[in-house]
């Protein structure tokens, strides 16, 4: 037992009989504890502090420097910090730190928290990533889901993913969420910010009917009726006929084709911009839901109402559920872009589910608003609606995780593996291709347009 206490830094105080007790010095800077020391008496002053397990005394300034060095300068954190004396292993505990300054006490508390987190890392302790939140969340994880996020609701109201620490991004995976925020979303925003480029191409070029490469109209010679492509093909930019079949009079034998030949299908093959619009609208709804929750919390704190504690709990849970639902609907837009961009049947079904879910959330929000303004709160009604909306979104999440199984995608097996069929052109694409190879190929799309 004595050996264990010694190794733990809990050995009893043993005063050296040869120690000169006529003067008390700081063991580091050698300053005397009392500035008024006259050399005639033993000085025992509060400025000199030791651990309960040894007699080595040090001034507050030296204690502060020593603890700061151990708190922030060591590579590996240890819960037990020993006495500053090199030959002493007495542990520095709260009994010693509470005699120091408030700043030192705060450093010690952070150090102990860090030590606890490192020691019990298997318990998965993490700080809430919300700005200004100091809550630490302890999550006992039995089995970790490798594919989908684990949503955590902090006491501050922030909802985040336990795996990647991003905001809760159900129903997409952590990798999908990271790609959406860092790559896909920026790409869609760039496409929206550059409408002039597409307009200029539509107004100043015509697709060659031979190779379908855009050919610029000669602005300096607008009377020039025939254009020459890099493939050596010549055609009329009004009716797309060759000089041989155009006619000798110079007039077009057929009405002019649309200037959007070859580009309409390309634009239709990029439906992600509509996902961006839905994403932005969902973000606005999410911000409003968070604002209503914060306003409710502030009103309860500043002006306590006549509502019972149970009523406040029901309203708070309802408002937090709305925030979670709005956040899920927001990230379902990313799911829309990632998983249904080229499967219009699934996209239409997903949009139907999103619209239905949004209507349910809006109706629930109105019910909470009406109950809040009413003189008497009907808890039974709100609890019933909370259960119903929770069940609806549970099945909604399950449906998206399973890949919208209600919509059967046509496919067939070939020697190269399974293929998916494009809804527009029925071309068989490999599952490794997110976009239809035929629709997104400029040559193929222009051939399809000319054949109409």
UniProtKB/Swiss-Prot annotation:
Residues 22-256 are annotated as: TRIAD supradomain. It comes from the Eukaryota. A zinc finger (RING-type) spans 26-88, 208-239. Zn(2+) 2 binds at residues 54, 56, 83, 88. Gene3D superfamilies: 1.20.120.1750, Zinc/RING finger domain, C3HC4 (zinc finger). It catalyses: [E2 ubiquitin-conjugating enzyme]-S-ubiquitinyl-L-cysteine + [acceptor protein]-L-lysine = [E2 ubiquitin-conjugating enzyme]-L-cysteine + [acceptor protein]-N(6)-ubiquitinyl-L-lysine. Pathway: Protein modification; protein ubiquitination. Zn(2+) 6 binds at residues 236, 239, 246, 252. This is Probable E3 ubiquitin-protein ligase ARI15. It comes from Arabidopsis thaliana. The gene is ARI15.
